[in-house]
């Protein structure tokens, strides 16, 4: 199986290796025109849960994982580049009317929309919100996007996801005085599952113009 932290394709270990399938998780991303018919498979993981899928031998490849990769020689990784995050709110949100950069104290008075860490065996991570801040926890970026558009809270989103909504005015980007606005993203894989299929997927991913656009070093 292959896991995307932000975008997913899958080739389950239980499937016929000669007939891998691909799932398009949303309209924001697709490596191929094929569709994965295994919607019951848990192919979407976030934060520590992404690396955990690799270290627990539940995935052969992960794409878009952030934070430090595992140090074991059983696994390899490649840096994809930086994932740019943008702090966004709906036009109806109170923070939309403030012209100056938003400081953490002010942001902390408003509900944060956050994605929960899918890790089961390791300590979960939290990013880009204050510990004392009220928050709504959602499953993935699609649900977070809907919550932000609905004005239920504020939060950071990858720029490549929200760019169309910023251009249309459905969401507004706000400057902040602090918070981690860029994440280093990785492609990781299990060395014990090395084979022709694994190498083919890695080459396909690393040579993808869309991947290079999403994760840049600018």
Tell where the protein language model's regions lie, with residue ranges.
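Alpha-helical linker/hinge and terminal dimerization helices associated
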Residues: 1-13, 17-20, 201, 211-212
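Central regulatory/effector-binding core of bacterial HTH transcription factors
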Residues: 9-71
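C-terminal regulatory
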Residues: 74-152, 157, 161-180, 199, ...
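Short amphipathic alpha-helical segments
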Residues: 10-12, 132-134, 183-185
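Hydrophobic residues within well-ordered alpha-helices
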Residues: 54-55, 147-152, 187
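Periplasmic-binding protein-like
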Residues: 178-191
């Amino acid at each position: 199986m292959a896991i995307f932290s932000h975008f997913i394709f899958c080739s389950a270990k239980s499937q016929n290796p000669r007939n891998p399938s691909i799932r398009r998780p949303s309209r924001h991303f697709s490596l191929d025109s094929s569709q994965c018919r295994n919607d019951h498979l848990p192919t979407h993981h976030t934060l520590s849960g992404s690396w955990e899928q690799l270290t627990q031998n539940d995935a052969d490849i992960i794409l878009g994982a952030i934070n430090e990769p595992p140090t074991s020689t059983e696994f390899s990784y490649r840096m994809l580049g930086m994932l740019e995050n943008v702090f966004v709110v709906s036009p109806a949100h109170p923070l939309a009317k403030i012209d100056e950069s938003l400081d953490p104290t002010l942001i902390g008075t408003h509900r944060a929309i956050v994605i929960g860490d899918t890790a089961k065996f390791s300590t979960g991570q939290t990013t880009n919100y204050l510990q004392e801040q009220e928050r709504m926890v959602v499953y993935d970026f699609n649900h977070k996007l809907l919550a932000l558009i609905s004005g239920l809270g504020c939060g950071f989103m990858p720029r490549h996801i929200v760019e169309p909504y910023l251009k249309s005015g459905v969401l507004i980007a706000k400057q902040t005085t602090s918070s981690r606005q860029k994440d280093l993203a990785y492609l990781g894989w299990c060395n014990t599952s090395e084979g022709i299929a694994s190498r083919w997927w890695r080459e396909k991913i690393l040579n993808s113009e869309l991947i290079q656009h999403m994760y840049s070093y600018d």
